[in-house]
């Protein structure tokens, strides 16, 4: 609220990235629809594991949306991606099923890692942070040789952790 008010005072735009909105129930949609300087960005790629689709939505004041529309490329999304999104938005049962499947896989992985004594952080997305027992970059390199891709970090706050993307129980148990 304080950020929104300050942005309004100075005429700035507040952009809320809700890329992981399927995994976290709090949203700024009401603000984006009611407050002229707030927009929400969402993507379809996180829940569907379709990063290559590169399709998302922007929700906000019609005037701001108009500026975005004027600045975008003529063919900024392919027709298959648009059809996919349109059909998906009309199938909340499919979305709910994907959320459930994703959560079951994440919960199973967290339970197994807890049994093995690892410190993990359940994040509000399709990933978790794990503190490995050895250097995070070395662990990442060893896992990559086994065709398991995780993401180590270089910054001071996260250098001791690896980020592991999560999926269905089947996907999480094949490694």
Residue ranges and their predicted role:
Residues 37-114, 118-121:
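PLP-dependent aminotransferase class I/II
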Residues 52, 124, 157-160:
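Short acidic/glycine-enriched loop/turn segments that link adjacent beta-strands
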Residues 60, 130-134, 166-168:
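Short beta-strand-to-loop capping motifs
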Residues 1-47:
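Active-site pre-lysine segment of PLP-dependent enzymes
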Residues 103, 112-146, 162:
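Conserved PLP-binding catalytic core of the aspartate aminotransferase-like
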Residues 5, 142-151, 155-175:
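PLP-dependent enzyme catalytic core of the Aspartate aminotransferase-like
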């Amino acid at each position: 609220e304080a950020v929104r008010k300050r942005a309004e005072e100075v005429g700035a735009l507040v952009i809320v990235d809700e890329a992981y909105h399927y995994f976290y129930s709090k949203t700024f949609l009401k603000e984006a629809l009611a407050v002229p300087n707030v927009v929400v960005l969402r993507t379809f790629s996180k829940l569907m594991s379709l990063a290559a689709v590169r399709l998302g939505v922007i929700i906000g004041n019609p005037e701001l949306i108009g500026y975005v529309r004027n600045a975008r490329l003529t063919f900024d999304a392919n027709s298959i991606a648009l059809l996919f999104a349109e059909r998906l938005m009309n199938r909340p049962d499919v979305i709910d099923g994907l959320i459930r499947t994703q959560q079951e896989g994440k919960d199973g992985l967290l339970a197994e890692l807890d049994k093995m004594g690892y410190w993990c952080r359940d994040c509000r997305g399709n990933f978790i942070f794990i503190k490995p027992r050895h250097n995070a970059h070395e662990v990442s390199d060893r896992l990559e040789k086994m065709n398991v891709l995780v993401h180590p970090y270089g910054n001071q706050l996260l250098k001791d952790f690896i980020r592991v993307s999560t999926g269905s129980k089947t996907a999480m148990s094949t490694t």
